[in-house]
Amino acid sequence: MTLVLSVLEQGMIYAIMALGIYITYTILDFPDLTVDGSFPLGAALSAVLISKGMNPVLTLVIAFAAGAVAGTLTGLIHVKLKVRDLLSGIIMMTALYTVNLRIAGRANLPIYNMTTLFDNALVKKVFSGALAPFANTIIILIITLIMKFLLDWYMNTKSGYLLRAVGDNETIVTSMGVDKGVIKIIGLAIANGLVTVSYTHLTLPTTSRVEIS
């Protein structure tokens, strides 16, 4: 049973990352390698912030914002500086490697006995008795579903429709008087925000040490 739960947890963790990659590779047709840097960015931020006593839920929000900033910078490099999409992602990925090490201060961070989304007083109270072994799986499932439904909601907004249109036919979007570059930047920001969240607190149930590099 432990092995099955672990597989489910890892699958749902990577499902959030897959949502972000789906936006860049499938919707925008943008080979974004920024995710190689924004993925461990979530680990670095979460480990540092929760070690300073920050609320775990707030850390998720901060991690998403940090990933969104990374995606925005990739978009700006591509759109404003006219750098090829693949190269702009490589530039940001390389920069984030240094940023992640700077944030963490070391190559790996211990996370023993820290208050996280999976180890706090509320979780111990709600998931007691027979539910205790399923606590991590249920929490990850809830977070994954929230991310999925929020993305579905966004994709049904005007901005979401424009995002899909840019990936299908940039000419139509331009003819509507919409800056396709701005839409690309928004898409990259959301995608990298999701990727960062996937490695924030979601790795904590499976390890006692977060690897940054």
Question: What function would you assign to each model-found segment?
Answer:
Residues 200-206:
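Conserved small/polar residues in nucleotide/adenosyl-binding loops
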Residues 149-189:
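Membrane-helix/interface signature in polytopic inner-membrane proteins
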Residues 54-94:
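Alpha-helical transmembrane segments within multi-pass membrane transporters and channels
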Residues 85, 89-92, 96-156, 185-186:
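Transmembrane helix-bundle core of multi-pass membrane transporters
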Residues 1-17, 45, 52-58, 129, ...:
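Membrane-interfacial amphipathic/re-entrant helices at transmembrane-helix boundaries
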Residues 17-20, 95, 174, 179-199:
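Transmembrane alpha-helices
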Residues 14-18, 38, 42, 46, ...:
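Alpha-helical transmembrane segments in multi-pass membrane proteins
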Residues 26-42, 77-91, 159-162, 208-209, ...:
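Short, non-helical or kinked segments that cap or interrupt transmembrane helices
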